[in-house]
């Protein structure tokens, strides 16, 4: 028998420009997700929670709040991209080419576009990824670029994790 560490995510050295990560988890968006998120964020646009109103639009049904889509697809990418994040530096060029509806299942993948050493911090590097989210039919519903500072190997707080006493 051997003791094996669980997945600890990628560190700066693990990324190569051009790498594509197909994030492992899909997520079906529910009516509750949409209503809860619009209430939580105080988004009062009727298109998100008034089925009668939405039935009169070109979409014929409520749209999922687009900021939920940003949050969901960002979250899906964490396991592969930013599990060892020092800081999220922001999103760029967020595009929402197609709507998300209640009942859609969203999947995502990210491509590494840039990688460089941090000029001010020796324990991290900076990567730029382009992430795309798509539904169960393969239709792209969101794309964005995200820049993150990622710890180098042996430099993260996880490196000082204590062992269980026996």
Which role fits each region the language model picked out?
Residues 1-17, 100-105, 109-166:
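HotDog/MaoC-like acyl-thioester-processing domains
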Residues 1-90, 153-166:
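Hot-dog-fold acyl-thioester-processing enzymes
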Residues 61, 74-79, 84-119, 134:
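Catalytic-pocket segment enriched in acidic/His residues
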């Amino acid at each position: 028998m051997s003791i094996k560490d669980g997945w600890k995510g990628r560190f700066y050295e693990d990324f190569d420009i051009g790498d594509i990560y197909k994030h492992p988890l899909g997520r079906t968006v529910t009516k509750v997700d949409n209503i809860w998120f619009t209430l939580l964020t105080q988004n009062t646009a009727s298109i998100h929670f008034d089925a009668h109103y939405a039935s009169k639009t070109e979409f014929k049904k409520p749209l999922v709040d687009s900021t939920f889509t940003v949050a969901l697809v960002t979250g899906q990418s964490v396991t592969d991209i930013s599990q060892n994040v020092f800081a999220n530096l922001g999103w760029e060029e967020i595009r929402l080419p197609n709507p998300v509806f209640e009942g859609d299942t969203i999947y995502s993948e990210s491509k590494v576009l840039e990688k460089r050493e941090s000029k001010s911090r020796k324990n991290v590097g900076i990567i730029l990824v382009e992430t795309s989210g798509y539904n169960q039919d393969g239709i792209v519903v969101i794309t964005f670029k995200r820049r993150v500072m990622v710890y180098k190997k042996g430099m993260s707080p996880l490196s000082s994790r204590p062992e269980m006493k026996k």
